[in-house]
Amino acid sequence: LGVFKSKGRLNKEPTSKYRSPFQRDRDRIIHSASFRRLKHKTQVFVNTEGDHFRTRITHSIEVAQIARSIAKYLNLNEDLTETLSLAHDLGHTPFGHAGEDALDECMESYGGFDHNLQTLRIIMFLENKYFKFKGLNLSIETLEGLLKHNGPVEDTNLVNKLIGLKTFKRKINFNTYPSLEAQISAISDDIAYNNHDIQDGINANLFKLEELMEIDFFKSIYLKYKKKINKKNYKIATYQIIRDSIDLMIRDLLANTQKNLKNLKIKSIKDI
């Protein structure tokens, strides 16, 4: 069910004897200027508020770690999954989604702004490091996974306006669901930020660990450690509860994924 063979790139290149197409994609992302710029962009907190709050770059690394673990268990392509995870936030603005909303309003007469499509603009046009082509010339599978981060493309007019449908050279079907690797990357994004935003919020004293009791999902986890929690080990308890939460979400995801694959009789990539 995994993607282990590439359809190639929009611009032909010699293959590598030492790295798969998806390893090369990952390496190009890591060495890009846009990836380095993520270190100053934050999820929730302003970058200057503290060294320990997460930035887009630390978030992307955490997403990649979660996604690789899931992909490995399901016998999918870990390199493609990691590539999509590392690249998924390249198009984000500073100041989180508020920054995106402000820029979208400013760019309304030019088609608006969408961070997922901006990610594609960056890797396809704005990162210029090669004589023969613009962008990073990533594999078709990586482009498709990023384009369909939220599922099949519903607004092809917006894609055409901001990127150009002809750019994809008819190598991507906009109406189908993305690969399992892309779906894992997307849900790993949710797992990472839902847990880590809570951890950052507690560390910033915006709310207390005890308040998680109001959320049914966290209540059972909190009660496991309630008797052990005190002022001295409060931070350790926070780490433990967040760690258990991530583990529970991953185990639930794996169980339901295997159940769905069986019930829906998914036998090949085409079935996805």
Report the location of each language-model feature.
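Histidine-centered, transition-metal-coordinating active-site segments
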Residues: 1-60, 64-70, 113-117, 122-272
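Short pre-active-site segment immediately N-terminal to the catalytic Zn-binding motif
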Residues: 14, 68-80, 109
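His-Asp-centered metal-binding catalytic motifs of divalent-metal-dependent phosphohydrolases/nucleases
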Residues: 74, 78-100, 119, 189
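Post-HEXXH active-site segment of zinc metalloproteases
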Residues: 79-83, 94-111, 202-210
